[in-house]
Amino acid sequence: TAKLIINTMIQKYGHDEGIQYLVDLDKNVEVYTKSGSGPSKNIGTGECTIGLGFLHDGIFQIVDQGYGNIELVVPSSGTSCEVGATAIFKGAKHPNAAKLWIEYALSPECVELAAQNGSYQFLVIDNAQQPEIATEFGLDPNNVMDYDFEDAKNNTDTYVAEVMEALGGGDDRFETEDA
């Protein structure tokens, strides 16, 4: 999630302005969480008042966890997005079973089951029923910026290093796991 936010700001505002936006925003950041769902959890428990993260995680906190103190704000200028992926590992011990799983995972039946169990993303599977609650909370598949996945693939490591350098890199607000 953090890498997506960094890429989004740089793509949206340009390289230098995007990094400066994140530096300016940093003045208001108490903690950088380990997980993308962390900000909405921290709002729900009252640990912070604003969080950046995926809208579907916020919906989950409101609907499934009962946090009525969360309000979702969708930027009118558009949001970025992520595309969930699934794959078969090269050399998998059971490739036929893995193929069957992939076929099921990419079926409308499977993604609709996920939506019934707290996964409120918009679906990209043909013929799948979109979770209505996502629209009720303001998610709009037409309000997505033209995200450059190729730029992200080629430059994410550099962008992250530049942002960390600009922020002064790794004080105790950054919740990281030991490598």
Give the ranges of each region predicted by the language model.
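Extracytoplasmic ligand-binding site segments that recognize negatively charged/polar headgroups
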Residues: 1-47
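Periplasmic-binding protein-like
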Residues: 4, 21-25, 32, 55, 104-129, ...
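A bilobed periplasmic-binding-protein/Venus flytrap-type ligand-binding module shared by bacterial periplasmic
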Residues: 7-11, 82-94, 105, 113-114
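Loop/turn elements at helix/coil->beta-strand transitions in domains of secreted/extracellular proteins
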Residues: 16-20, 46-49, 67-70, 96-98
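Beta->alpha turn/N-cap motifs
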Residues: 36, 53-58
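Short, hydrophobic alpha-helical packing/hinge segments within bilobed ligand-binding/sensory domains
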Residues: 39-42, 48, 58, 98, ...
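Conserved C-terminal helix/tail region of periplasmic/extracytoplasmic solute-binding proteins
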Residues: 139-179
